[in-house]
Amino acid sequence: MKLVAPFETSMDRTDVRRILLVQADVDGVIGWAECVAGEAPFYSPETADTAWLMLRDFLWPLIKEKDFSSADQVWDLLARVRGHNMAKGSLEAAVWDAEAKQKGVPLARHIGGVREEIACGVSIGIKESLDELAAAVQKELAAGYQRIKIKIKPGKDLEPVRRLRQDFPRIKLMVDANSAYTLQDWPLLKQLEGFYLMMIEQPLGWDDLYSHVALQKKLDTPICLDECIHTEEQARAAIELGACKIINIKLGRVGGHTVARRIHDLCQRHGIPVWCGGMLESGIGRAHNIALSTLSNFTLAGDVAASKRYWEEDIILPQVTVSPQGTIHVPTAPGIGFEPRLDRIDKLTVRKERLA
């Protein structure tokens, strides 16, 4: 699926998304989910191709002949495979959707959600010029989004933030480095504190908790961890070591709803706020993010935005929309609450496989 506009981070630039969709037939009820792995292993070691192989050859065989009484047992069946959370999460989430449909309840309620609407922020990629960035921010504020996140990298950090604080002094603003810096860059990151940021997301290495501990001691601005957190155990270590003050929970990165809820609960017990990050999902993945964001400790606006921000035409009906107040109404229909557009999915599909 071609994006409405290219999206650039410190790691790469995305113009087109190759999306892996997963259907789970649970006693005749179809659940849908999306594997968020990208085409290249820049954000995560996983790719769409590795996820396909893992689902077909390793993960599906682990559950195909197993009896389980609830969706929250699927994760434990898949845990024998190390890593590959995005592949695991897509299979597990599809089962959650099917189970919610079987019970006739919205997925949000089924996983323990408490909100009827969620607050929305927006993530803006690296732009060629400061004027282009400021115009993009103005457009998103006019659309109602409650929080602005911009991607940064060395050479495109202080000046973009300075410009936005000059033009928009009162907005909720944060930055995301996607591991673009090292601990030796801490004096530069310290300079960002003068711009009253909500947080600095994943400034250092994607697997480096130790350096984040040292950096957080030098900063008053909260560090938010993203790529460092793949498991409940890593989240616990980050919290107890003091590596961060906020955690971004991405459904695919942690392996699905079961682990996402465990991390959510852990953070809540320790007073660590969380929010839901995005991975340029289609509407199917976005629907799961909406449900996840209804849990009580998702107190910060996440990267769950309207379909039209990313796609000329989404693959669900209705498309995800954001209110003028910057919120998304949580659907009340059973399961994810949106209908996959089978005609459009068939038109876009280049490969499929049925596992029985």
Predicted feature residues:
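C-terminal extensions of enzymes
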Residues: R309, I315-A356
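N-terminal amphipathic alpha-helix/helix-capping segment at the start of soluble metabolic enzymes
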Residues: M11-R13, W75, A79, K101, ...
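Metal- or metallocofactor-binding catalytic centers and their adjacent structured scaffolds
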Residues: D25, I30-Q102
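Metal-dependent enolase-superfamily TIM-barrel catalytic cores that perform enediolate-based chemistry
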Residues: R109-L219
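Structured beta-strand/loop patches that form or line metal/cofactor-binding pockets in enzymes
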Residues: M1-Y43, W311-E313
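Conserved, mostly hydrophobic/aromatic
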Residues: V22, G28, L59, L91, ...
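Shared catalytic-loop signature of beta/alpha-barrel
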Residues: Y196, D207-C224, I229-T327
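Hydrophobic faces of well-ordered beta-strands that scaffold small-molecule active sites
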Residues: A33, C120-I124, Q146-I150, L173-A177, ...
